[in-house]
């Protein structure tokens, strides 16, 4: 501050009366000092960030008094001008030549709206930017961006409140895309470090913090801007930062454009309508003029967003609608002279009134200190409340995290338990797989053996079929030979019969005896006829057998062992009929294989001891089949043609897994058929069926089976999960003991047995069927509470303050609720909607004795209004005292002069 103290007011202001004007606007009451609140409000109009303004205040107010003198205020203005022109904010910059500062002030057109955004240097220094870039790269950005999840831990490490961190994120995310690039991350870290240094975070991002890459481009290029700035400095002769229409008239007319077009360009560039153009507006006007002259592009009817000067973009909505006259700088100089004289007089007067001023200064200082302390206490109390709220939030968050930790531990235990179970299951499955693999290998070996056995049996079958075919081939000529022999025998027998008839006829002619005898024996004609009929029957039977054997469906039958009949040696008629009596006429078969067997065609003549009595012999007086059965010696009845089955000893497919059968048949092992409709069962089974009707009304008790062997499915489903309790109706109530539709009752007792369960079922329905549930009654809706203004205030019934209406007393006035209130334990879901006693609703949760929310709001409003009135009264009193003091001082000065 020593360097600043050496500079005079003229050196600080560079002879520009604007500094004096700014001072007079802020300094009120001719006290010679600028209060901190007034100076802060005025300096914020410069558009600089709060961080830079705070630094400027610290450099100006070196003593930390909280007030600025005139010289200190000029130093602050000079530093503001340095910051607006991109110079370093330090005391060494006071000696540099800079234009006067510019402030946002709608009362004067001479004050610009602040520096150009494009001209402002970035507040983030290069060394800080390098440090922030290193942090940015350590977070592993994706495509040059960091998401909120990656930036959040870095911001939380600063230990700043969540509200401030949220504001930092909103300010740094300039693109509002939910991600931060390298420049945006640098802005965020810059704001975080500023907040850690107890500097306030702005509500909106200052222009100086906007990265150059995020600043909108202007249609006027930097080269054009530099050229137009030189023209502007030559035109702005009063150095107030603006050019009027008179100053630029000649310059614009030299372009050769029509006056109407120049007027349109002037109206477009004069965005504030103050009749003057700033440096940026002047550059835009010349840009539009050159576009028309060089490219022939007419100016637009209104400015596009990229045409708006950067200095006017922030204050575009605050356009100035009126113009004000140019300030009279000569009058300002005279006022400055008078002010210097007054200062000299005040210095002389200070020697006389030094004690009084020191006391007043002490009082004011103490007052300001007290006020500062009060403000500090208020701020600290607010911070304490915020910290307490944050502490509560952290505690709640910690509790939630503890709960989540407990839940996760439980889930972890469950998962570990499940993993152990799964591991055990896997081990058991592996063991089962190993056993199954061993079984499969054994089954494969058995299958190979079975296939070998099958191939062997197939070969044996083929051999047997070949032997059968060869036997058939041998049988066919034998059968044919047999037929021929039978035909010859039948023809021979016919010839013998005819011969006998002729002989009988001849004998009847000459015989006179009553009992004539055949010439060659005692065999009569009936025996011959019998033998002939037997021969005919045998021929028919042989033909039928030959026809059956010739069919292809009976090729597998075994070879029949038939007697081979050789052609008999038939003697002539003289040899066939012999003279000796009672001899048998026997056809002979000369086959070696059947020589010892009985001849099926041997006809034994009946022993007729008596001769024919009469010549008129009746051959049908006696039954020729009484003595013997002609078919008792059937050669084809003793041998089974299918007895030689080659596969009856073993099943060639027994080892195949697809033809295996269980060792026990579930439908044959049971002793009784449970589905048999026969009525030969005992009365106990009938009664059991009658008592075990699962479909009777109300359900019946299904008695357990007395004998487990009667279950036809026990061998199949005995070990299954549903084998014991599948379709088990044993849990039903015991109501009906008889089944009216029992199919096992015999017809003789069905009427009595069916009539009885029907009567018993009717009785059981009326006695044991459970009653139906009562209909559900909806819960009565809760009555709406009375409005706050109409709440009844209950008076105390008792003088005892402890015996108030307890809203949570469940049994008012009863000592033993169990005895005196029988409805206490009643069913709350019964259909009855009326109760013996109705509870008083006013006794439940009665908070009418306390003030309502509306009353509290009204009280808060009254208190805030009262405090505001007191504050305004104090301010008015202070202003009145200052005014009286100023009047007294001016009167004393006038009287002395």
Swiss-Prot record:
Biological processes, Gene Ontology terms: clathrin coat assembly; endocytic recycling; Golgi to endosome transport; positive regulation of receptor recycling; postsynaptic neurotransmitter receptor internalization; receptor-mediated endocytosis of virus by host cell; regulation of cell population proliferation; regulation of protein localization
Binding-site residues, Ca(2+) 1: 173, 175, 177, 179, 184
Annotated source species: Mus musculus
Spans annotated as Disordered: 528-607, 667-692, 741-849
Listed Basic and acidic residues bias regions: 585-599, 758-768
Keyword Zinc-finger included in the entry's annotation: no
Sequence repeats: 599-601, 623-625, 629-631, 634-636, 640-642, 645-647, 651-653, 665-667, 673-675, 693-695, 711-713, 806-808, 827-829
Bias type Low complexity, positions: 667-685, 744-754
Effect of residue 883 to A: Loss of ubiquitination and interaction with UBQLN1
Domains: entry comment: The EH domain interacts with Asn-Pro-Phe (NPF) motifs of target proteins.
Keywords, ordered alphabetically: Acetylation, Calcium, Cell membrane, Coated pit, Cytoplasm, Endocytosis, Endosome, Membrane, Metal-binding, Phosphoprotein, Protein transport, Repeat, SH3-binding, Transport, Ubl conjugation
Location of the EH domain: 15-104, 128-216, 224-314
Post-translational modification: Phosphorylated on serine upon DNA damage, probably by ATM or ATR. Phosphorylation on Tyr-850 is involved in the internalization of EGFR. Not required for membrane translocation after EGF treatment or for targeting to coated pits, but essential for a subsequent step in EGFR endocytosis.
GO terms of molecular function: calcium ion binding; identical protein binding; polyubiquitin modification-dependent protein binding; SH3 domain binding; ubiquitin binding
Annotated protein name in UniProt: Epidermal growth factor receptor substrate 15
Spans annotated as Interaction with DAB2: 2-330
Source superkingdom: Eukaryota
CDD domains per UniProt: EH
Keyword Cytoplasm: yes
Main location per the UniProt record: cytoplasm
Annotated segments matching region 13 X 3 AA repeats of D-P-F: 599-829
Main function: Involved in cell growth regulation. May be involved in the regulation of mitogenic signals and control of cell proliferation. Involved in the internalization of ligand-inducible receptors of the receptor tyrosine kinase (RTK) type, in particular EGFR. Plays a role in the assembly of clathrin-coated pits (CCPs). Acts as a clathrin adapter required for post-Golgi trafficking. Seems to be involved in CCPs maturation including invagination or budding.
Annotated positions of the Phosphothreonine modification: 321, 779, 781
């Amino acid at each position: 501050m020593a360097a600043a103290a050496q500079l005079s007011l003229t050196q600080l202001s560079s002879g520009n009366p604007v500094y004096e004007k700014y001072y007079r606007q802020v300094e009120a009451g001719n006290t010679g000092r600028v209060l901190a609140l007034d100076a802060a409000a005025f300096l914020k109009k410069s558009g600089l960030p709060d961080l830079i303004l705070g630094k400027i205040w610290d450099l100006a107010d070196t003593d930390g008094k909280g007030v600025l003198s005139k010289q200190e205020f000029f130093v602050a203005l000079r530093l503001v001008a340095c910051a607006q022109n991109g110079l370093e904010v330090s005391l060494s910059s006071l000696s540099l030549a800079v234009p006067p500062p510019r402030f946002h002030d709608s009362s004067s057109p001479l004050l610009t709206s602040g520096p150009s955004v494009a001209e402002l240097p970035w507040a983030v220094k290069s060394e800080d930017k390098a440090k922030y870039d290193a942090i940015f790269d350590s977070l592993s950005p994706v495509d040059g961006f960091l998401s909120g999840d990656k930036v959040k831990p870095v911001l939380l490490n600063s230990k700043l409140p969540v509200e401030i961190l949220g504001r930092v994120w909103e300010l740094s995310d300039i693109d509002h895309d939910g991600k931060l690039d390298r420049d945006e991350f640098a802005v965020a870290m810059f704001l975080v470090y500023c907040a850690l240094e107890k500097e306030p975070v702005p509500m909106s991002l200052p222009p100086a913090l906007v990265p150059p890459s995020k600043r909108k481009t202007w249609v006027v290029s930097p080269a054009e801007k530099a050229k137009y700035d030189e023209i502007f400095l030559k035109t702005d002769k009063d150095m107030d930062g603006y050019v009027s229409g008179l100053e630029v008239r000649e310059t614009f007319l030299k372009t050769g454009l029509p006056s109407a077009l120049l007027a349109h360009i002037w109206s477009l560039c004069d965005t504030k309508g103050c009749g003057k153009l700033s440096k940026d507006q002047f550059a835009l006007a010349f840009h539009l003029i050159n576009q028309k002259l060089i490219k022939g592009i007419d100016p637009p009817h209104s400015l596009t967003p990229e045409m708006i000067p950067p200095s006017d973009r922030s204050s575009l909505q605050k356009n100035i609608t009126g113009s004000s006259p140019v300030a009279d700088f000569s009058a300002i100089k005279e006022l400055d002279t008078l002010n210097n004289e007054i200062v000299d007089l005040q210095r002389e007067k200070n020697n006389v009134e030094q004690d009084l001023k020191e006391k007043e200064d002490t009082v004011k200082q103490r007052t300001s200190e007290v006020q500062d302390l009060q403000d500090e206490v208020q701020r600290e109390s607010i911070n304490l409340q915020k910290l307490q709220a944050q502490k509560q939030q952290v505690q709640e968050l910690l509790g939630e995290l503890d709960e989540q930790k407990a839940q996760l531990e439980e889930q972890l235990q469950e998962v570990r338990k499940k993993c152990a179970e799964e591991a055990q299951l896997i081990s058991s499955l592996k063991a089962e797989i190993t056993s199954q693999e061993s079984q499969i290998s054994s089954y494969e070996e058995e299958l190979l053996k079975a296939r070998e056995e099958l191939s062997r049996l197939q070969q044996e079958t083929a051999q047997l079929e070949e032997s059968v075919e060869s036997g058939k081939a041998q049988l066919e000529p034998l059968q044919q030979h047999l037929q021929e022999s039978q035909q010859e025998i039948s023809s021979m027998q016919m010839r013998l019969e005819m011969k006998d008839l002729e002989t009988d006829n001849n004998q009847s002619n000459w015989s006179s005896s009553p009992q004539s005898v055949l010439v060659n024996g005692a065999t009569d004609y009936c025996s011959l006829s019998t033998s002939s009929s037997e021969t005919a029957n045998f021929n028919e039977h042989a033909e039928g057998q030959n026809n059956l054997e010739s069919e292809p469906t009976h090729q597998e039958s075994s070879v029949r062992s038939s007697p081979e009949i050789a052609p008999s040696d038939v003697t002539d008629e003289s040899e066939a009929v012999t003279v000796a009596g009672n001899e048998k006429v026997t056809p002979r078969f000369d086959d070696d294989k059947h020589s010892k067997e009985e001849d099926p065609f041997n006809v034994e003549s009946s022993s007729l001891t008596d001769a024919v009595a009469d010549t008129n012999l009746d051959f049908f007086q006696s039954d020729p089949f009484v003595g013997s059965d002609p078919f008792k010696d059937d050669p084809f009845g003793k041998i089974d043609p299918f007895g030689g089955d080659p596969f009856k000893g073993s099943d060639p497919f027994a080892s195949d897994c697809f033809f295996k059968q269980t060792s026990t048949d579930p439908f044959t092992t049971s002793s009784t058929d449970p589905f048999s409709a026969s009525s030969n069962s005992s009365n106990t089974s009938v009664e059991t069926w009658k008592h075990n009707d699962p479909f009777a009304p109300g359900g019946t008790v299904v008695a357990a089976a007395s004998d487990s062997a009667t279950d036809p499915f026990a061998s199949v489903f005995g070990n299954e999960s549903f084998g014991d309790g599948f379709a088990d109706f044993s849990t039903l109530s015991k109501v009906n003991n008889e089944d009216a539709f029992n199919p096992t009752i015999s017809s003789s007792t069905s009427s009595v047995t069916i009539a009885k369960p029907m009567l018993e079922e009717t009785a059981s329905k009326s006695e044991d069927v459970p009653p139906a549930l009562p209909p559900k009654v909806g819960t009565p809706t809760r009555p709406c509470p009375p409005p706050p203004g109409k709440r009844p205030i209950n008076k105390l019934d008792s003088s005892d303050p402890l015996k108030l209406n307890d809203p949570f007393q469940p049994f008012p006035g009863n000592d033993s609720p169990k005895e005196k209130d029988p409805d206490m334990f009643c069913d709350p879901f019964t259909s009855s909607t009326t109760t013996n006693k109705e509870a008083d609703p006013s006794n439940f949760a009665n908070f009418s004795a306390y003030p309502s929310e509306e009353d509290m709001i009204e009280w808060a409003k009254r208190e805030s209004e009262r405090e505001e009135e007191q504050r305004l009264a104090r301010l008015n009193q202070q202003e009145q005292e200052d005014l009286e003091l100023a009047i007294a001082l001016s009167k004393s000065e006038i009287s002395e002069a």
